[in-house]
Design a protein with these regions (language model features):
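N-terminal, positively charged/glycine-rich alpha-helical extensions of SAM-dependent methyltransferases
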Residues: 1-25
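Conserved S-adenosyl-L-methionine
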Residues: 201-211
Length: 234
């Protein structure tokens, strides 16, 4: 799929993640950092959503977060513009006996269908889209009034360049080289400014720090590299 509408994933990003689909569920493979990060990401969402209901996971990839949300009791729909990860996600969920739905689709497609959800997540996605402000506007149109949007991404700081880009991809080799473009990282202040015209308000943030020796993630007050954000639709 090569959708180039504003806010959509870039075609080269879609191709990149299609290539990774077969190895997505390997905890020792190229997606190992996401496997390690997943409990922190999904647990933070869980702690902010007391009610169990419908949840849309935008840019779900092969379903790491979507499956975790389904196990928590959410009624999950995962969408991704890349077909191969969706195929891997569907097969993995079937093997695990989990009841959740996946579609090869963009946020634009669901907006056109008039779909709305009380909870929308876009984890490690916004740094891969053409226009973050337009992407946030699309996500706001997928939320029910008062709904919550959860973003997980990387801050654009010198530390994130050193740690999240150069260190992770070229020194520690935690991620395949070229996974991220540092110039596409977004600061929390930029996220807040981009979200406000869409009626979204930033209500909570949490930093995520990686322990290289333990190969584990922990929550922290440090937002300088990886961080989580919760936004609410007025």
């Amino acid at each position: 799929m090569t959708n180039t509408q504003p806010g959509s994933a870039l075609p080269d990003e879609i191709a990149k993640f299609n290539r990774l689909a077969a190895e997505w569920w390997d905890p020792a493979g190229p997606m190992a950092p996401l496997h390690a990060m997943n409990p922190l990401r999904t647990g933070w969402v869980d702690s902010h959503v007391p009610e169990r209901g419908r949840l849309l996971d935008v840019g779900c990839g092969a379903g790491l977060a979507a499956e975790a949300f389904a196990r928590m009791g959410f009624d999950v729909l995962g969408i991704d513009a890349a077909a191969d990860p969706i195929a891997a996600a569907t097969a993995h969920a079937e093997d695990a006996g989990l009841s959740l739905a996946y579609r090869v689709a963009t946020a634009e497609a669901l907006v056109a269908e008039g779909m709305r959800f009380p909870v929308v997540t876009a984890l490690e996605v916004i740094e891969h889209v053409t226009d973050p402000a337009q992407f946030l506007a699309l996500l706001s149109r997928l939320l029910e009034p008062g709904g919550s949007l959860f973003i997980s991404t990387l801050n654009r700081t010198l530390r994130s360049l050193a740690v999240g880009k150069i260190g992770a991809e070229y020194i520690a080799r935690l991620l395949p080289a070229g996974t991220h473009e540092w110039r596409r990282f977004i600061t929390p202040a930029e996220l807040d400014r981009a979200a406000r015209p869409a009626g979204l308000r930033l209500v909570a943030t949490r930093g995520m720090s990686y322990d290289l020796r333990e190969r584990t993630w922990r929550g922290s007050a440090d937002l300088s590299v990886n961080y989580l954000a919760m936004l609410r639709l007025a």
